[in-house]
Amino acid sequence: ELRNKGLMAIAVSLIAILIYIALRFEWRFALAAIISEIHDVVITLGAISLFKIDVNLDTLAAVLTVLGYSLNDTIIIFDRIREGIKTSKKTELAPIINESVSATLSRTVLTSGLTLATVVILYFFGGEMIQGFSLALIVGIIAGTLSSIFVASPTLLWFKFSVLEFRNKEIEKAKRKQDKERNRAMYEKGTV
């Protein structure tokens, strides 16, 4: 029963992630993030199985923590990619992704390294009760860091993401926003 509830919690969180990223970015970003998240969950669950860790609420919490941690890394990189698309003069996505990942790499490695150091200490000194949780987190953090760099971003290339099309949509959004603000200002002045 716990396994079924855990899988349901993971499925619900993946759906929520898909919706959130699709609203915040674009559907291709959302699919790339979900593929990355599935990668992390499969590797973490594989480690739980490989090391014969008891599946309990602690390991379920570890898997969900890995999902959140990896999603945070992925969103930071995607945000930098989106910013690069808007500001770069390049029209191809691959160089923009490369620059964006390079710009966030030191932050990603430092954050993951410090978190990993804390979880490793927790594994060795936290006692037997928390070792399963810690080991699942160790594997998940490593998988999440690698997937946000090497899985999520390159997946955008597979989905034929068009930089020019994205820029045109952003220009249209800006025009609609400007028109809306102008109409609102005219309404407030009473000139409509």
Regions inferred by a protein language model and the residue ranges of each:
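Hydrophobic alpha-helical transmembrane segments of membrane transport and translocation systems
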Residues: 125-192
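Transmembrane alpha-helix detector for multi-pass membrane proteins
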Residues: 60-80, 102, 106, 111-118, ...
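Alpha-helical transmembrane segments of multi-pass membrane proteins
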Residues: 13, 17-20, 65-72, 140-144, ...
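Internal alpha-helical transmembrane segments of multipass membrane proteins
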Residues: 3-43, 47, 112-124
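Transmembrane alpha-helix boundary/anchor motif
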Residues: 26, 42, 46, 70, ...
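Short helix-capping/hinge motifs at transmembrane helix termini and TM-loop junctions
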Residues: 24-27, 51-53, 125-127, 160-161
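Pore- and gate-forming transmembrane helices of large, multi-pass membrane proteins
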Residues: 1-2, 6, 90-125, 135, ...
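Hydrophobic transmembrane alpha-helices and their membrane-interface caps
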Residues: 29-81
